[in-house]
Amino acid sequence: MAKEDVIEMQGEVTENLPNATFRVKLENGHMVLGHISGKMRMHYIRILPGDKVTVQLTPYDLTKGRIVFRTK
């Protein structure tokens, strides 16, 4: 997947799920499943419900995404 093919959206984590997966509510109201990117795992960045995050979605499956940034 090329970097230009991703769609970046802002959202808020609503629920923790097993295996470092989260339910994220996007700005437009849609709910997606998000998993933590490898760099965030490597640097032990914790994500809790209520955190604002940036999610990358692919045009092929808009129901799942990768959490790439946690805003303060």
UniProtKB/Swiss-Prot annotation:
Q: Which CDD domains match?
A: S1_IF1
Q: Where is the S1-like domain?
A: 1-72
UniProt main location, coarse? cytoplasm
**An example Gene Ontology cellular component term from the record?**
cytosol
Checking InterPro entries in the record gives: NA-bd_OB-fold, RNA-binding_domain_S1_IF1, S1_domain, TIF_IF1
Q: In which compartments does the protein localize? A: Cytoplasm
User: How does this polypeptide assemble, per the annotation?
Assistant: Component of the 30S ribosomal translation pre-initiation complex which assembles on the 30S ribosome in the order IF-2 and IF-3, IF-1 and N-formylmethionyl-tRNA(fMet); mRNA recruitment can occur at any time during PIC assembly.
Q: What does this protein do?
A: One of the essential components for the initiation of protein synthesis. Stabilizes the binding of IF-2 and IF-3 on the 30S subunit to which N-formylmethionyl-tRNA(fMet) subsequently binds. Helps modulate mRNA selection, yielding the 30S pre-initiation complex (PIC). Upon addition of the 50S ribosomal subunit IF-1, IF-2 and IF-3 are released leaving the mature 70S translation initiation complex.
Concerning its family, UniProt says:
Belongs to the IF-1 family.
Protein name as annotated: Translation initiation factor IF-1 2
List the top taxonomic levels of the source: Bacteria, Pseudomonadati, Pseudomonadota, Betaproteobacteria, Rhodocyclales
The encoding gene: infA2
